[in-house]
């Protein structure tokens, strides 16, 4: 979730089971790990220069620790973290805690999806041509975007935090997503979901890691 939407797609297309990706130098210099012989890098497109070029990242599964390597574990949200995470979400986003953490995820997703629409509605309305959104007025585009984005964000938060979104949502909950059925529309929705999910998950990660440090 720490990569932008277009890079998430490229990582998933090449290595759907990847869990934590970084460039060779990060694993070597920052983490004290080496990329194992025979590993294949995941190609990403770097557009930061005058001309696009490929850069490569490696999943943690492609690496192994050297002597005195820094410990590396993916953060995991457990039941003991929920109270701290709920308090953080209330403080950061002014959403109530009643109904449990999943209900709180939904409220946060609703709020941030609407904020994103307010800031980006001109761009969103500019990509409706040839999609199922074509012909909608602005209010209906807003509702379609908010519902599609909020549901997708909640799904992403639940999945990364160890819940089972497939058992929580019904297929019809995702019907608004299918209105975004052109490459431009998919990109707009995917970028929104990626940016918002990243923001919330980074805050959850910080909260979980702080709780673990306080226990030590």
Listing of model-derived features with the role each one plays in the protein:
Residues 1-216:
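N-terminal accessory/interface modules of nucleic-acid-binding and processing proteins
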